[in-house]
Structure formats: C-alpha cells, structure tokens
C-alpha cells in the first residue's frame, strides 16, 4: 500500500539543532542539526514504512504573505550561523538518501506540503514541529507533531485534534485569526488571548461568525472585536495554508526506494555518521550484519515489569553482587545486563503495593562503585527523601559525558547514547555508554579530573544543598517595603517629567516618550526599532533629568522582583534557602546555582550588598566567608611564566598600581586612583582578550590611547602575550584548549565562517585555561574544606564564584577560619602564592 511522508524540513532542522547543540565533526564543522534530522528520519522510515517521501524547504525570498503584510515573521531572529552552514549539507544528504526536495520561491514549506497532501489520495503523514499544519488533517492525512526536540512525536488525527478543543481542522485557522501567532507575527485581534479565542469559537463556531455577532458581544471584548475585524480577516488569510501551489510534482517524482543505495551509505560515512548506518537498511551488496557491526553498539532488550516488593527482593537476591544500571524517574528502571530492562512500578494504592520509598530502600544496600547512574546527586536526594543513605559512589555517565565532550550537557538518554556511539533509549544502554566514555576519558587524559575532583564533589554539593542557608525574612520584608516605596516615588517623578502616565517597563512606550515627545536623540537601533537599553540610556544620562530616574527605577525593580521577592518564595519550611548546584551546565567547569541563583546577587552596589544582610547564621553560630584574591591574574602569572608578573605577586605588590606605573610611565608612588582604576580594567580585560576598542569603551577614552595601554602592558609582561597567542594557535590545531587539570573545552567557533563568532572563539581560547583552572581550584578547595571540617560543628554552605561560605559555632570561629584559609591556599601549588581573604559575621553582609 502506498504511504506518503511529507517533511517540514526547516521546522525539523531547527528542532534538531537545539536538541543537539555543539555537535561537530573532526574538522570542527557543525553537524548536530543534520545528525538529529537524519536520526528522526531513520526512525520514521522504520516505523511508518513510507513508499513516497518529499522534503519541503523554505527559501530566503519573500512569500506572498510578506507581500500581503510587511510585518509577517518580522520578529523572528535570524537563523544561527552554525545552522545556516548545515542547510546545504543536509540538502545534499537528503538527495543522496533518495528523497525528493521540493521548494518554490514565493511559497513556504507549509504551502508545498499542503498542496501535496491534498493532491494525492493515499495515506499521508506530515512531520513537523509547526502547529499550522494541523489545519491539513483530513480522512487520509495525519500530522506527526514533534515535541521535546526530536525525541517525542505525537500523532494528530481528527479525534486527537477534537480532544485539544478544535472541532474541525479549519478551526486552527479561525483560532489563529482571533488570537494571532507570535512566532509568525500574525497580529490577530489585539487583546484576545488563548482562552478567550477558544471560548469565542466554542460559542460561535468560526471567526466569521464571531465577527458577524460582534455587536452582540458586550463590554471591552465586543469593542476589541469590532475594532479588530480587518486585522482578524488579514490574520485568517495569513494563517491559511495554500493548497494550490503551482508545482509540477507527481507521485512518481517522490517515490522512495528502500533499502538505501550504496551512495547513501557512503554519504553518511563521509559526514562521520557511521553510527547512523546501523539504523538504515542498504541494498544487498553492502548490507552489514549486526554480528559484524563494530561501528555502533546496538541495544536490544526485553522489558519486565515488577510491581511488588517480593519480586523486587527476588530480583536483587538472584543478582546478588552484580553491578547494575539505575535510572529513577516516575518509575525506577534497573538493568543488570544490556538485554533486559526491569521497570519497577510504584503503587500508591491504599491497600498495598510499593511506594518510591519502598523501592529505593530495597535498592540502596546493593549500590556499589561499579553500578552506573546518570545523575548521582539527584539520586542521593531521592535516597534522602526516602530516608535511606548509601556510601557507594557509582559511575555517573552524565558527569563522564560532560568531561569527555568538553563541557556539553545532555538532556536525555537518546542524545547521550548517540554521542557515545550507542543506539538505545533506556537504562540498558548505560553499560555500553559508560564503557565508551571511560575509554574516551582515559585517551583524553581526564581520569584524574573525574575521579579526584568531579565525582567526589557530587557528595559535597549534595551536603551543601541539604544544609541550605538561613534567611531572615524580616530583612527581606524591610527591603521590599523600602524598594516598593522608592519605585512609587520614582514612578511619580518619571510621569511628571514625561507629562503623562505610561508603562515604564515597555520599551516601545518608553521610546515614544524619550525620542518623540522629549526629543532626545537616539544612538542605537535594534531589530524592532530604537533601543532603550542600559548602554543607550547611560549615554543620555546628562541629556535630561528623566534618564537617571529611569535607570534607578530599573535597578530597584530588578532588585525587588528578582532578589527580594524571588528569595521570599524560595525560603523553605525550615527557614533556609536550598539552592541547587548544576555541575554539568557551563563549558568552563564553573558551578551554576539555580532555584534560586545565589551567584548573581550584585555585590558592587550598596543595594546589592544590602540583600546579603538577609543571609544569616543560626543562633549561636557565625558565617565565615573566604575569597580568593585575583585568582585568574595569579593563574596568568603561573601559566604564562612571565617573570615580571610572578615577581610582582611574590613581592606582594599592588598589581594594579604596578601595572598603572608601567602603562603610564610613572613612579609607583605617583599613581593616582584613576590610573589604578584604569590599570585594573586593563589587567582584567587582558584575561578576557579585550580589544583596544573594547577597552576604550570601558574607560571612555580614545581607541588610540587604549591601544597604547595594551601595547605597554604586553611590553611589561611579554610572556602573557606569548601565552595568549599560543592558546589560540593550539586551539586552531587541536580543536580544544585545556586547564592545568586537563579539563577541555571544544573550540568549534574558530572554524566558523562568521567573523564575530571566530573572534569570540579566540577570546574563549585565551580565557578558558584561566577561568577553567580557577573553577578546578575552587572545587579542589571545596573537597579539602569539607574533609578538614569533619569533626567540627562547621558546614560548607555556599560557593559563589571564588568564594566559599561556611557556618560554624561561635566558639569554633577562629579554628574554622584557619581550616578554611589553609584548605583554600593549599588547594594547589603555583609559582605565585594563592591569597585568601577571610571574614566572619552574623550575616553574609558582615562576613
């Protein structure tokens, strides 16, 4: 029987790109979107068994919709450069796979798909991540809607569409005509949202019926509909897919031959997608038997469900001493081998069964260091919630992958498995994934980083998350009242200068007030019009008294909403805030704090520092803070080997004053405060590869002067320049850079065709060895601190950049301060001293 598969290629490519970011071939060319697209295609071919396939693409040229409405898709961001580069490569590969590409200037892929779906009467599946195509559903056409990137597909037919509240497929168009579509910038009727649009359609059936009855609809809603009739009809036309596109395509043109040809296989191998060849069938001459396939580990398994405690006990008794793979979610998945998956079902029945606590209590005693999990810290929290403890430290493939793939995170098993050359979708793949990653870990010289730093750190972070930090809600309430009062005062003053009330938080309305009404001269535009960002407003600071008020309003509003109100919501029943530390999120190796983020509390403003007053010690305890001094500059001295920089630190000189003396050509005694501030900007700017233009902007000086400062800096510290240039050259040659502890960061940016991306890559290559090493050192310090605090009352609570915060009994303050200082200063031996500042108090503000 004939079966047609229509691919909305641009939509699928976008989803694949964001599902597999950062994937590159051995030459640094981006391939993640192509890999994801072809992975999905392999699954579709296997499951849907199409006899005909067409891949529809959008073209750059404007369509009839753009000619009809200039704002159509005007708010869309341009396609990322790394994705643009993959489009022609994908098109060639699609052709090599024997699939017809269909595109036509003036029309979108949706229109081509709609035309083909209506032209042929055979069963048809449209594969897309765009809900517009739901209007094409009929008796022979379904839509396979992609969700969660590329890992989940939902089949939509008339019945499923009805379940979502749409009586007919055409109701999708009516809905968009009323509500609009932000992604395509289809306006709809202003002021009508999702709920109102659905209620109107439920009452009146169609958009035209809504408009016809507008006079009967009372209040503001009726007024909106009457005023928006023309916009609704325009939106209806924009949202309607054209099913009569003039394309000369017949069924014979889109016939799909399967198994694939030899050239298709060679095309996949040429793109280094050897693992994907195992997911397609090829013609007899090159069919590869699974027994002889060494390119990819393909996992096949049977599933066994366990729903009672006796069977669970028997499972572990029968496999006593064997390592197992474990993944805990809604259910708990266990595998002792790759060919059998045990799904342990929770049962909340009042009359018996197993709860999650029962399951975890049974599993915990069997956990060993040879077991494999995907997120150890998360598992430790589940065990804690179940009231059980384990001293075992199993292998963590999430952490392994993060190190092996240079700081990349993985959202699910499928994408992680694909990266590890394994074809699988369950915990049964964990052993094969782990084997692959451990070999890569060894070959990339990352074993010590994993075993000695990252893996043991998971328990330290778990303990910190459990401990949390006490928050004085009274301080937050005081600050909330203070900030709300100031916002009210600022608002009144801003309205007075503006001569009218308006939404101060609306860039559009603010633009009208500043540039149209008050006549200020704009200095910058963005894609949606004139910019009113902080940079623009600061340049206008002296032009009108309203500007300082707006800047202050934004500052206080941010403090109130993000920090004061955000922290109030985050306080747990124990009166403490328990942040979560993400260990595999950043590509520098630095930890990331979330829910709430305690690492971005501002420290440079008086108001920002005030918020730290809310973080307090328990009664009878103190908070002790220890902070590395200029750690990245000290690392620059050590890693560059520059004698002048090393000497300055060994002699405990004021490094910023020393640099100022050199770049200004004055005696150090004659360095002014302004000179020192400028030198400080140079010192820290150099670490991040700052340009003369960037330094000139930071210091508000001429570019020529900034260039002189940088040249004098490199004359003073010549090996710094050699080191930075050397890192860029190493990255170009090897595709990555390393820290002192061998952490790697992949550098695909350096092979980008985009100049700005390449320049960013150069700066990242210069900075990562320093910032990444600083991250490694603070982690080592955390491990030493946690170990050395054993036997005391103290607990490590927070890590914020280069700072550690500990809570201790007041009578142990001096002892703990000494432990903290020594643990941090001896974390690693450098050619310059690591200096740590230690302070204590009843609050983080005082410490």
Describe the function of each predicted region.
Residues 228-352, 423, 429-603, 622, ...:
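Conserved "right-hand" nucleotidyltransferase catalytic core of DNA-directed polymerases
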Residues 52-54, 105-108, 129, 302-316, ...:
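Conserved DEDDh/DEDDy metal-dependent 3′-5′ exonuclease domain
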Residues 335-338, 401-424, 429-430, 583-667:
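Function-dense linear segments that define catalytic or interfacial modules
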Residues 466, 578-579, 584-586, 661-792, ...:
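Conserved catalytic core of nucleic-acid polymerases
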Residues 21-24, 74-246:
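Extended two-metal-dependent nuclease catalytic cores across DNA- and RNA-processing enzymes
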Residues 17-20, 71-85, 139-167, 222-223, ...:
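Short alpha-helix plus adjacent loop in nuclease-associated cores
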Residues 485-492, 496-547, 715-763, 767, ...:
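C-terminal polymerase-core module
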Residues 1-54, 58, 65:
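Non-catalytic, usually N-terminal nucleic-acid engagement modules in DNA/RNA processing proteins
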């Amino acid at each position: 029987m004939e079966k047609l598969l229509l691919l909305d290629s641009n939509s699928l490519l976008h989803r694949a790109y964001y599902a597999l970011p950062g994937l590159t071939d051995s030459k640094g060319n981006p391939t993640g979107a192509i890999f994801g697209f072809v992975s999905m295609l392999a699954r579709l071919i296997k499951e849907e068994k199409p006899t005909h396939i067409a891949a529809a693409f959008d073209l750059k040229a404007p369509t009839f919709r753009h000619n009809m409405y200039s704002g159509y898709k005007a708010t869309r961001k341009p396609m990322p450069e790394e994705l643009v580069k993959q489009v022609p490569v994908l098109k060639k590969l699609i052709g090599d796979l024997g699939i017809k590409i269909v595109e036509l200037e003036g029309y979108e892929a949706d229109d081509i798909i709609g035309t083909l779906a209506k032209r042929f009467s055979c069963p048809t599946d449209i594969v897309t991540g765009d809900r517009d195509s739901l209007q094409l559903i009929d008796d022979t056409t379904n839509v396979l809607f992609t969700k969660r990137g590329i890992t989940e597909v939902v089949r939509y037919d008339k019945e499923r569409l009805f379940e979502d509240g749409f009586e007919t497929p055409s109701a999708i168009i009516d809905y968009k005509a009323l509500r609009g579509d932000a992604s395509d910038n289809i306006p709809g009727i202003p002021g009508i949202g999702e709920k109102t649009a659905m209620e109107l359609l439920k009452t009146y059936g169609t958009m035209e019926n809504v408009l016809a009855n507008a006079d009967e609809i009372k209040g503001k809603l009726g007024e909106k509909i009457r005023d928006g009739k023309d916009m609704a009809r325009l939106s209806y036309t924009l949202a309607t897919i054209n099913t009569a596109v003039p394309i000369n395509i017949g069924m014979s043109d889109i016939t799909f031959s399967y198994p694939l040809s030899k050239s298709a296989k060679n095309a996949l191998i040429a793109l280094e997608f050897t693992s994907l060849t195992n997911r397609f069938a090829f013609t007899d001459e090159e069919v590869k038997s699974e027994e002889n396939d060494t390119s990819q580990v393909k996992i096949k398994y049977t599933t066994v469900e366990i729903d009672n405690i006796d069977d669970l006990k028997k499972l572990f008794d029968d496999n006593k001493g064997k390592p197992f793979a474990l993944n805990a979610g809604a259910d708990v998945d266990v595998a002792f081998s790759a060919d059998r998956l045990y799904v342990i079902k929770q049962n909340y029945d009042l009359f018996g069964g197993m709860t999650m606590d029962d399951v975890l209590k049974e599993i915990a005693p069997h956990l060993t260091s040879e077991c494999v999990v995907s997120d150890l810290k998360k598992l430790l929290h589940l065990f804690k919630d179940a009231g059980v403890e384990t001293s075992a430290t199993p292998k963590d493939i999430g952490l392994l992958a993060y190190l092996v793939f240079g700081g990349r995170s993985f959202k699910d098993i499928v994408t992680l498995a694909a990266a590890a050359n394994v074809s699988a979708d369950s915990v049964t793949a964990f052993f094969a994934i782990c084997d692959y990653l451990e070999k890569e870990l060894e070959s990339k010289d990352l074993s010590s980083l994993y075993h000695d730093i990252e893996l043991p750190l998971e328990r330290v972070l778990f303990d910190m998350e459990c401990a949390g930090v006490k928050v004085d809600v009274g301080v937050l309430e005081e600050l909330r009242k203070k900030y709300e009062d100031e916002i009210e005062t600022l608002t009144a003053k801003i309205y007075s200068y503006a001569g009218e009330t308006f939404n101060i938080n609306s860039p559009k309305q603010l633009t009208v007030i500043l540039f149209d009404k008050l006549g200020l001269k704009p200095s910058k535009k963005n894609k949606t019009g004139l910019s009113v960002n902080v940079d623009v407003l600061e340049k206008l600071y002296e032009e009108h008294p309203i500007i300082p008020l707006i800047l202050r309003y934004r500052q206080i509003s941010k403090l109130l909403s993000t920090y004061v109100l955000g922290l109030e919501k985050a306080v747990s029943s124990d009166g403490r805030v328990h942040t979560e530390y993400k260990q595999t999120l950043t590509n520098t190796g630095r930890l990331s704090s979330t829910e709430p983020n305690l690492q971005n509390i501002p420290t440079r403003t008086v108001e920002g520092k005030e918020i730290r007053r809310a973080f307090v010690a328990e009664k009878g305890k103190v908070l002790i803070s220890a902070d590395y001094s200029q750690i990245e500059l000290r690392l620059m001295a050590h890693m560059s080997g520059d004698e002048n920089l090393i000497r300055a630190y060994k002699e405990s000189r004021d490094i910023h004053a020393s640099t100022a003396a050199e770049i200004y050509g004055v005696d150090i005694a004659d360095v002014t405060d302004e000179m020192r501030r400028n030198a400080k900007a140079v010192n820290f700017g150099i670490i991040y590869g700052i340009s003369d233009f960037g330094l000139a902007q930071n210091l508000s000086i001429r570019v020529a002067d900034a260039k002189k400062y940088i040249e004098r800096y490199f004359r003073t510290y010549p090996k710094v320049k050699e080191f930075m240039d050397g890192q860029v050259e190493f990255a170009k040659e090897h595709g990555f850079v390393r820290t002192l502890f061998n952490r790697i960061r992949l550098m695909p940016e350096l092979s980008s065709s985009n100049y700005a991306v390449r320049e960013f890559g150069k700066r990242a290559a210069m900075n990562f060895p320093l910032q990444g090493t600083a991250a490694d050192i603070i982690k080592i310090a955390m491990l030493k601190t946690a170990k050395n605090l054993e036997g005391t009352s103290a607990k490590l609570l927070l890590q914020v950049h280069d700072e550690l915060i500990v809570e201790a009994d007041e009578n142990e303050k001096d002892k703990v301060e000494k432990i903290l200082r020594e643990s941090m200063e001896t974390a690693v031996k450098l050619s310059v001293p690591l200096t740590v500042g230690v302070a204590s108090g009843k609050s983080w503000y005082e410490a």
